[in-house]
């Protein structure tokens, strides 16, 4: 009987201790995070990009209208006077730049800069769940809240970043911050995500990018308006865009 007492004590202690929470489904975590950034498959997002010098002095501002659609497709229309009429089209891993007065789309890379440290891939508002495979690093404390730390590996070579370290709020899976790495595994940028509300966030209103390679300048990508709207399929064809520059 005396030999059974330690066993009974161990069983009783294990019953009283809190059970470890099951690890979350990383696929669901990533899909939830995307919903704060791109809530619908077909959206029009009005975007303002501001750059700041390393001392915090405002530098430049640009305006963009971004059309997102199914099949990893985005069309970026440049609205500022210095870029008026220029367009960037993304279809899958292919990116094209269309200039006013030309009928030949130019291929570019998703990492090519549009303004400051905002690249074509950043402005195009890509979905992490479509382009990356996620693994759970663990639960951590970040931004004064409990977070899930994910490691995202690119599924293809055509994305802006080959690896992303992403931190999501533990309860709502709200994106909080990210480290963005190039194919060489160099840390290119650090991103911080600003929601529309601290208490009850429904969407990301701003992404703040800080360069980690050279000038340490700051670029703020602010989403000023979102609207669910489908556009003609021809808008996602580079040759059709070249023939119809006014999108009439």
Identify what each model region corresponds to:
Residues 1-2:
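N-terminal secretory signal peptides that target proteins for export/translocation
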């Amino acid at each position: 009987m005396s030999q059974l007492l330690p066993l009974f004590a161990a069983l009783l202690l294990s019953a009283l201790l809190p059970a470890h929470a099951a690890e979350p489904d990383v696929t669901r975590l990533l899909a939830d995070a995307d919903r704060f950034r791109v809530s619908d498959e077909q959206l029009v997002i009005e975007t303002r990009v501001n750059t700041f010098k390393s001392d915090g002095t405002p530098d430049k501002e640009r305006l963009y209208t971004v059309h997102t659609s199914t099949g990893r497709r985005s069309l970026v229309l440049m609205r500022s006077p210095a870029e008026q009429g220029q367009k960037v089209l993304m279809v899958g891993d292919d990116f094209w730049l269309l200039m006013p007065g030309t009928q030949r789309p130019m291929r570019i890379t998703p990492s090519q800069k549009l303004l400051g440290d905002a690249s074509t891939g950043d402005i195009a508002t890509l979905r992490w769940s479509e382009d990356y495979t996620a693994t759970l690093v663990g639960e951590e404390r970040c931004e004064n809240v409990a977070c899930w730390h994910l490691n995202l590996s690119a599924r293809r070579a055509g994305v802006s970043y080959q690896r992303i370290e992403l931190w999501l709020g533990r309860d709502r899976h709200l994106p909080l911050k990210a480290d963005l790495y190039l194919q060489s595994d160099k840390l290119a940028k650090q991103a911080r995500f600003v929601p529309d509300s601290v208490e009850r966030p429904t969407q990301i209103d701003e992404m703040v990018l800080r360069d980690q390679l050279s000038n340490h300048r700051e670029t703020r990508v602010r989403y000023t308006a979102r609207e669910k709207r489908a556009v003609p399929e021809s808008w996602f064809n580079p040759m059709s865009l070249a023939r119809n520059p006014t999108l009439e």
